[in-house]
């Protein structure tokens, strides 16, 4: 094969006349360029480390401070209050240094120390300022004078042109709430869900815990919070994600869909070429830390950026007791799956990223390849879809050496995984409901063997060139993947574009190395494990009842006329829909973020409250007047927003109780209260997909360029998982999941109730979809 010869830098043969040495200049050139690329990345990391290390100051400010100190010395002004003189005396006891040299060195040393002190003062001041969260609880649209002054001070101490990780050391630590406060909020959250006798029993357990065991566990948790960067995140990652022994497909991984109504080209290889290039451009901005940190409140309050570190070059590695996350600093290839074969594709040539047309060329070569899968190769990824222990044992037994290890390393150390899917998915006008549902299900689990579920992201390109992502959950949360996905869709359509015939712009390049097949030697025993895993995963996938639908009757624009939070509006609609569907209330999970704190991830908002229940019951009671319903709606919305703010500012319920439970396990003490709290099922699990880069899309000019967002599998066997994205002013997309095996749930039925609930609530305000009010 030609590519095999290109990979050899030199060859030699022994002849009677001596050694005949033949050099491959092209191979040597690529080796040289690869080395230069590696050193360039190291230099960029070193430079960024310095810039981030001195933030909120800048490296150039060191020169300003030092020059200022030395200049003041020449004017006989001592800014050091005698410290420079002390440094001067201790510099040279031998008398070999001239007086002028000692003065300059002393000035530089003092100036450097002063510069470091200024940096630390600014950083600490910024951390103190960012610890204030009173602005979040202010009335919407109103800002007090003190808050304006506080914002101005934050901007002063925030420096200029921050890089992706510039604010990390200035972010406050997640505070540990008081045990009594958490217990009190917990009891308030379950009050509407329990009968009187059950609530009294739980109250007794909670009060006993708050007085006796709770303070002891809290002491250890406080101790951890003093030395750990975040007292929750490492345990959350380990015990909620990595120690789970069940399948991560459906149960943990989630998916993202692309634009609903627009497909910019129908050439599969071309769409893959453009979007892979866009992903690589995004990866480059992350590697160079050029991505702007996300900031709230008019680009003032920074959020933690730590989760971007493992977006690429990352894979979850199975273990018998616990999994681990493997992240490599750099990866120069991707692995592509097509028709049962695995291909390794290099991403660089001549020291640069492959261009979109070159990537299209690579993808087309894979699509045109007629070779057959090796024994056991086609369904190999089913191991990543089923239980973790069989996969861990199989990996250790059959993939720890030889060609299997080399090929598995190529997959696990790839920048990301790509599937060129053989099916066609996406919105079809003749059958909109079934087509969108099929699209979502394909991204969630595919055929159970054509996604590498352990990779941080699996990028899927369907035969008709629709695209999507399946993401592993342990390394980061959905907003990180969402941010990438917004960039990819906008760059693909508005920046890169396509030629008139649907191909990527640019020319082919005959000199780039062709994709290479990964080689496997999978014995019969391993193939049996693969088939068993596939059977288990298929059973799980076939049980998923997934309904994804657009709601375009009204959107955020009309909801804002109600003077309420769009998220609170939708959450109350979900409560009303659930009651219509089930005839009862249930413990409800809404994901909130805690990225106002360093290494923060998520917190739970318990959306089913006494106030929301009162509103729902009023809506179901035909004797209740519209005025009464309206009043109860407002009260319920205010309560929900208050709970959301508490969760964002570190005063949530569930992460604190989870960590107390972990401490109790380490101490080998039993807590009936914690055990019961953590065993309560979330029969309605919800999450909003935030739109973070609104400047990338002009929905007034391009109304059809709306994203569908993404979704996840049901959390409880007899419950619903609901995800939604609010796009522009007039569009909301919902994803509802449940299990066919549950006689109580039906995702399509819940969807109908949700549509009706949205209409019922908007009617309270006398508004319709076409209202000019």
Curated annotation (Swiss-Prot):
Binding site for (R)-carnitine: 589, 602
Binding locations of CoA: 555-567
Pfam families: Carn_acyltransf, CPT_N
Mitochondrial intermembrane topological segments: 74-102
Record note on disruption phenotype: Complete lethality during early embryogenesis. Heterozygous mice are prone to liver steatosis. Compared to wild-type, heterozygotes show minor differences in blood glucose levels and in serum free fatty acid levels after fasting. In addition, ct1a deficiency reduces inflammation in CCl4-induced liver injury mice.
N-acetylalanine: residues bearing it: 2
Record PTM Phosphothreonine, positions in chain: 588, 604
One GO cellular component, as annotated: mitochondrial outer membrane
Regulation: Inhibited by malonyl-CoA.
InterPro entries: Carn_acyl_trans, CAT-like_dom_sf, Cho/carn_acyl_trans, Cho/carn_acyl_trans_2, CPT_N
Biological process, per Gene Ontology: aflatoxin metabolic process; carnitine metabolic process; cellular response to fatty acid; eating behavior; epithelial cell differentiation; fatty acid beta-oxidation; glucose metabolic process; liver regeneration
Summary of subunit composition and partner proteins: Homohexamer and homotrimer. Identified in a complex that contains at least CPT1A, ACSL1 and VDAC1. Also identified in complexes with ACSL1 and VDAC2 and VDAC3. Interacts with ZDHHC4.
PANTHER family found in the cross-reference section: CARNITINE O-ACYLTRANSFERASE, CARNITINE O-PALMITOYLTRANSFERASE 1, LIVER ISOFORM
Function: Catalyzes the transfer of the acyl group of long-chain fatty acid-CoA conjugates onto carnitine, an essential step for the mitochondrial uptake of long-chain fatty acids and their subsequent beta-oxidation in the mitochondrion. Plays an important role in hepatic triglyceride metabolism.
UniProt name for this protein: Carnitine O-palmitoyltransferase 1, liver isoform
Organism: Mus musculus
Phylogenetic placement of the source organism: Eukaryota, Metazoa, Chordata, Craniata, Vertebrata
